[in-house]
């Protein structure tokens, strides 16, 4: 009887232990199920986040493609502006050459005027000394008149040349205004590209990439942005250089205009002297 009691107690103790182990196993199973459900939720959330990141990266890629297109357009505009600046330089060189030739003709006309004046003085002295030699005096007067006419024709030709130079300068000024407008348009496009790049950079910084492939793609896009930023800085520098070149050309045009005014005044003075000399000669 005592043995049966002991056996029953042992069986009861074993039953209690089994119940405890079963409860522990059930608790572990519940914990495992909770962890499994949590892991599944995390996996679904991670997959959703990766899909969202891929969508955002696709949008960023489209924005980068559009930015590359705008950058190419900007570079083409800058190349056009540089070509215009080179054409302006060539035109100014031609104007300077015309001005040098006109100055040479002015020197010739001035020399002939001096020669005519000297001849007129000599003619006056000869007229007083040789009043009875009218035929000789008339021939000399005719020669002086011909020289004066030739000098006047050269002065008129020089005036026409300077009018042509003035017309060319007006064309240069119009070209300069168009170049300045293109430079201003290029600057506004650069500002727009910088703003777009800033937005792209902020979007990339806000992405929380948890998958290695997405991280690699983000790094590649950031490298493209750095390259585009460097290209934009280079384009800005080229635009600034083009603007400085236009300003320099404008100063050169102003200088040439001043020289034109000065040369026209010299021509007017020579023309007045020719008219006065001719009047004095015809008065005798």
UniProtKB/Swiss-Prot annotation:
Entry-linked Pfam families: Tropomyosin
Family matches, as InterPro entries: Tropomyosin
Keyword entries, A-Z: Allergen, Coiled coil, Repeat
Cleaved signal peptide residues: none
The UniProt record lists the keyword Phosphoprotein: no
Coiled coil feature spans: 1-284
Membership in a protein family: Belongs to the tropomyosin family.
Domain notes: The molecule is in a coiled coil structure that is formed by 2 polypeptide chains. The sequence exhibits a prominent seven-residues periodicity.
Subunit structure and binding partners: Homodimer.
Protein purpose: Tropomyosin, in association with the troponin complex, plays a central role in the calcium dependent regulation of muscle contraction.
Protein's name according to its UniProt entry: Tropomyosin
Organism: Dermatophagoides farinae
């Amino acid at each position: 009887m005592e043995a049966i009691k002991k056996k029953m107690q042992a069986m009861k103790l074993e039953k209690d232990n089994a119940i405890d182990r079963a409860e522990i196993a059930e608790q572990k199973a519940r914990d495992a199920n909770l962890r499994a459900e949590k892991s599944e939720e995390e996996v679904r959330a991670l997959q959703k986040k990766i899909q969202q990141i891929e969508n955002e990266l696709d949008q960023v890629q489209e924005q980068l493609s559009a930015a590359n297109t705008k950058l190419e357009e900007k570079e083409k505009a800058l190349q056009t502006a540089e070509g215009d600046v080179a054409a302006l330089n060539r035109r100014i060189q031609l104007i300077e050459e015309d001005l040098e030739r006109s100055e040479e003709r002015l020197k010739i006309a001035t020399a002939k005027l001096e020669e005519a004046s000297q001849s007129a003085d000599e003619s006056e002295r000869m007229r007083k000394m040789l009043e009875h030699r009218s035929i000789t005096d008339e021939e000399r007067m005719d020669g002086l008149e011909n020289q004066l006419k030739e000098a006047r024709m050269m002065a008129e030709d020089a005036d026409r040349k300077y009018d042509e130079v003035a017309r060319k300068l007006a064309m240069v000024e119009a070209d300069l205004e168009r170049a300045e407008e293109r430079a201003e348009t290029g600057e506004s496009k650069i500002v727009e590209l910088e703003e777009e790049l800033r937005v792209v950079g902020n979007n990339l910084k806000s992405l929380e990439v948890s998958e290695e492939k997405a991280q690699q793609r983000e790094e590649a896009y950031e490298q493209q942005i750095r390259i585009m930023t460097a290209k934009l800085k280079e384009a800005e520098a080229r635009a600034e250089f083009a603007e400085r070149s236009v300003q320099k050309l404008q100063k050169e045009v102003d200088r040439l205009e001043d020289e034109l005014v000065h040369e026209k005044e010299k021509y007017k003075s020579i023309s007045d002297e020719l008219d006065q000399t001719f009047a004095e000669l015809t008065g005798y």
